[in-house]
Amino acid sequence: MGAGLLLLALLSSAEPGPTSVFDEDRVGIELGARASLGQTFWVLAAAGPSFGAEVRLRFGPHLGLGFALETGTGKSPDIDHPWTLRRKQIAFDLQWRFDTGPGIRPWVSLGMSFGTIDLEYDDLAFRASAHTVDFARLGLGVDFLVGRFLAIGPFVRGSLGHTHLAAADDPPEADTGRSLDSLDVGVRVLIGF
């Protein structure tokens, strides 16, 4: 009887372990999906949705290295010749999660991306494609831990990039190097292992 009471006292005084895999101090994997609405700034701004799937290697509760496949479209409000941009890219980033209390994990990330961008005018036969690179992508967000394996939350991401995408009114031999920046606001869902 005394040994049972002693064991019960020891177990009740032991600190509980992490309630979420995102808080565990070990290497883990996260699979995620995200959807956002944003602006792409090229010659003019183009607005539209983008989607992504990601795999993240988690080193403890704070540091993560992520890899993502992303696609998005944007329509221009240009009155003379409206156009659509379609972007496909591979991205990677380093992410740091902050421990602010039970169930809430703000985070910041910094990364790069590489891909292609396609331009199509709604009323012209002109089409163009080019490679694109985001030299810097800064992300800010909050993960709300739901249960042991799930995190969901909003994010904001801005990027500074470059492309040589030609527009319909560019001269044939012109240097078409231009900035290609973007700002996205969306939500992501992660499953942790």
How should each PLM-predicted stretch be described?
Residues 1-8:
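Sec-dependent signal peptide recognition
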Residues 155-158:
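Internal, hydrophobic beta-strand segments that form the core of beta-sheet-rich folds
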